[in-house]
Every structure is written in C-alpha cells, then in structure tokens.
Amino acid sequence: MSQWTHVNASFRLDSIGEIPDEKIIAIFGECVDYKGMSNIEYDENYEVKDKEKYLPIGSEGSLEMNIWHNPDKSCMASTTVSVFGDLRDYGSFDEIKKWFNKCCDSFFVRQAICQVEVEGAGIKIFQNN
C-alpha cells in the first residue's frame, strides 16, 4: 500500500521589481512529472541525487508550482508562488518543513503557509517566522 503526502503551500514574496522565475525555481526546485523521473540521477540506495534541485519529490514525480507576478510593477507585493500536489511513497513532515523554511529564508517573504497531510499520520501546518 502506498503512503501519500498531500501538500498545499502559498508564498507571498515582496520585492521592488520582478523576481525572475529562474531565481525562484533555483531556490524552490524544479518540477518533475512521472515521465521525467527517468531523467533523474539516483544513488546506490535508489534515493534521488541532488534532492535540493527539485521540488519535494515522491515516487511518481514532484509537487507542482505556479508563479504569479503582479502586473503593477510599483507594488511591493510582487510575486506569489503556489506549490501543491500529492507525493506517493513520501511520508516526511520534516523534509517538507526544511524545504519550506529554505524557501522562506531565501526571499523577503511577507506571508507563507504550508499545510501537509501525511495519510495515517495527520496534518501539520507550517508558517514563516
């Protein structure tokens, strides 16, 4: 039986001017779908090498991400990043929390919240400090 982890996170990034998508992806991680899993390098224990390069990733792919830029370039609330999805064979609150904190610490984050449900283990909510 598979272990499923459900994630829904939203980040409000403040800045003067637009934050390039490439900079956001470099910190948050790349999306990988099921087909893309064959292009990832694995170690001798079948663990993903360079995990920090990707969004949190399960056995069928990573979480998904949408980036929205405020068309009003004079507004401090410049960008929102939404990260969501279901991870198969993944059951770690701690890894998601570590990833969430890394994302929050890398930008001027006005607000961020992440709800994680690990089936059979409950729900945890993380917020930026």
Describe the function of each predicted region.
Residues N39-E41:
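Surface patches in mature domains of proteins
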Residues M1-Y34:
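Short, extreme N-terminal segment that most often corresponds to the first beta-strand
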